């Protein structure tokens, strides 16, 4: 007895469904914004200016210090950097005043 084997045939059917892209849908955009804490200045108790005028004082000098470009030579005006400022602070090279006893705190 002989047996005959038939090759198995299989059929594959692929169905592709396409959804038409609708042009009527609007594009949604979300914009996220960071809620920053508001800056608030608070003064230590007993902080009064040096003229005893009962005003709160800051560590900034009352005299404007003009910023100079980095490449500008100021060797001729070196004495002007310490211009008659009799306040209780030192001036940095950037022209800002710094005090050894800071009298304000920023939150």
Curated annotation (Swiss-Prot):
A GO molecular-function annotation: protein serine/threonine phosphatase inhibitor activity
Gene Ontology cellular component terms for the protein in this record: protein phosphatase type 1 complex
Acidic residues composition-biased segments: 71-80
Biased composition (Low complexity): 1-14, 95-107
Pfam families xrefs: PPI_Ypi1
Region (Disordered): 1-40, 69-107
Expression across tissues: Expressed in roots, cotyledons, leaves, flowers and embryos.
Biased composition (Basic and acidic residues): 81-94
GO terms for biological process, alphabetical: embryo development ending in seed dormancy
Domain of life assignment: Eukaryota
Signal peptide: none
InterPro entries per the UniProt record, alphabetical: PPI_Ypi1
Function: Inhibitor of protein-phosphatase 1 (PP1). Binds to and inhibits PP1 activity. Required for early embryogenesis progression.
Protein name: Protein phosphatase 1 regulatory subunit INH3
Organism: Arabidopsis thaliana
């Amino acid at each position: 007895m002989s047996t005959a084997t038939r090759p198995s045939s299989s059929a594959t059917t692929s169905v592709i469904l396409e959804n038409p892209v609708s042009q009527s849908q609007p594009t949604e955009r979300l914009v996220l914004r960071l809620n920053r804490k508001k800056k608030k200045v608070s003064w230590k108790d007993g902080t009064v200016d040096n003229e005893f005028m009962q005003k709160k004082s800051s560590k900034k000098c009352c005299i404007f210090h003009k910023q100079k470009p980095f490449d500008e030579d100021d060797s001729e005006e070196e004495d002007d950097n310490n211009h008659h400022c009799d306040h209780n602070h030192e001036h940095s090279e950037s022209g800002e005043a710094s005090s050894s006893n800071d009298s304000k705190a920023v939150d």
